[in-house]
Swiss-Prot record:
Organism: Yersinia enterocolitica serotype O:8 / biotype 1B (strain NCTC 13174 / 8081)
EC assignment: 2.5.1.6
Pathway: Amino-acid biosynthesis; S-adenosyl-L-methionine biosynthesis; S-adenosyl-L-methionine from L-methionine: step 1/1
Protein name as it appears in the record: S-adenosylmethionine synthase
UniProt-recorded Gene Ontology molecular function terms: ATP binding; magnesium ion binding; methionine adenosyltransferase activity
SUBUNIT field: Homotetramer; dimer of dimers.
Main location: cytoplasm
Amino acid sequence: MAKHLFTSESVSEGHPDKVADQISDAVLDAILEQDPKARVACETYVKTGMVLVGGEVTTNAWVDIEEITRRTVREIGYVNSEMGFDANSCAVLSAIGKQSPDINQGVDRADPLEQGAGDQGLMFGYATNETSVLMPAPITYAHRLVERQAEVRKNGTLPWLRPDAKSQITFQYDDGKIVGIDAVVLSTQHSDDISLTDLQEAVMEEIIKPVLPAEWLSKETKYHINPTGRFVIGGPMGDCGLTGRKIIVDTYGGMARHGGGAFSGKDPSKVDRSAAYAARYVAKNIVAAGLADRCEIQVSYAIGVAEPTSIMVETFGTGKIAEDRLVALVREFFELRPYGLIQMLDLLHPIYRKTAAYGHFGREEFPWEKTDKAALLRDAAGLK
């Protein structure tokens, strides 16, 4: 596998699945703002002219689901009926119940550190030193393309852009190192009054060139900009959207394994979310410490049990110390019980709406991106 291609994709904040994710996390944030100990599992479905918000919530807080939903959709940019979805006129339906007491009795404990996991499951975290944010380059730059699409849409640089968009980048690797970009795909929703030629030229100049490093582009790089020729109907009018359907976009773009659990709409007692964040934190600190060039962590849990049922470290032949030694360091320096990792990463705050578009990892504003354990790990490993 000396030379190979690897591809990752991302989607914009206006993609219907991401609209659903953002509504779910906006509801979560509103509840956590009033009640940090709330139990929240919020799922959202969006389609032409309607939003259905459902799930299980146990809290003393009261939040206005309809107002939160409309505000979120408005901020994304769906504000007129020509797009098939309008924050001001769409129907908002709520079907939220309480969390099962059977689950709750397995989670709550007199000693908070003995709080059990909210469900069984396996979670992965990953880091690599191929970018400055210790994330794989394909997903990092795929995110940056659609983030740039939203920026030039909202600031009026390209006023004919609409909220829905997708990106995909194929990188060329040689012996594990990036040598170039083989292909770029960017499909963006647009108004009916822009020609394909003008759109392709503007997207190249205002989105692709400002984002992708010139040294990775060449005359052999292939560009597919709105390759169907037309993308006027999009967003929830084009496809229904559901919370939790973009789990690879949310994580590592396929470069690492995935346990299957989605993130959005879940409070930190759900290890699907919080333990995946903790696993990223562990992997990133191992790479930042110079103990490996690439690192993947797996943790697993049983419902109602505090201690992880397993911890695994894989360094793909790049580790500077043995992997069993790395596992011992993880156990020594990181708290991976559900309550402990919530405290370690300070997760009981309304920070989740921002995670719900453009990736949960590689963004320095989030606490699981800290590398504050790197020096401790390096010293403990005996590396100078």
